[in-house]
């Protein structure tokens, strides 16, 4: 697993990785000016947030045809269609881990999610039309 990004919890995350003996399996890459090569190479994109407005990185992963797992934060249902172009998992650690594990154990599901991402139109035109309709 590769973690891209940075934040105040990094020391705690490093500690948890060490406590679990996962230093060889979980690599913290830190901030990347160009994360797209990593996203393109990944099998799965996970956004384990407690809150998000509109997570641009979720959409970027979908545009790259990657299955996406996000936690059930307040706006998660607006980010993806659960089971169609991604999966929404519980926000707690155990529920999130169980949701990821279930997806990884299902060999047919990840390719189907990827295919759905590739087929879906993620352009902003539909959102812009809704916005203009609100002003009428």
Which residues are covered by each model-predicted region?
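Conserved acidic donor-binding segment of nucleotide-sugar-dependent glycosyltransferases
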Residues: 82-83, 87-93, 102-107
């Amino acid at each position: 697993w590769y973690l891209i990004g940075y934040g105040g919890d990094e020391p705690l995350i490093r500690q948890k990785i060490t406590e679990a003996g996962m230093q060889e399996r979980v690599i913290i890459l830190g901030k990347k000016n160009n994360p797209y090569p990593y996203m393109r190479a990944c099998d799965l994109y996970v956004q384990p947030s407690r809150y998000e407005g509109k997570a641009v990185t979720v959409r970027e992963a979908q545009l790259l045809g990657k299955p996406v797992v996000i936690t059930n934060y307040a706006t998660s249902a607006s980010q993806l269609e659960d089971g169609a172009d991604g999966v929404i998992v519980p926000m707690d650690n155990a529920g999130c881990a169980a949701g990821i594990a279930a997806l990884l154990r299902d060999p047919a599901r990840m390719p189907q999610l990827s295919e759905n991402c590739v087929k879906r139109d993620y352009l902003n035109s539909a959102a812009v039309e809704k916005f203009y309709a609100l002003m009428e």
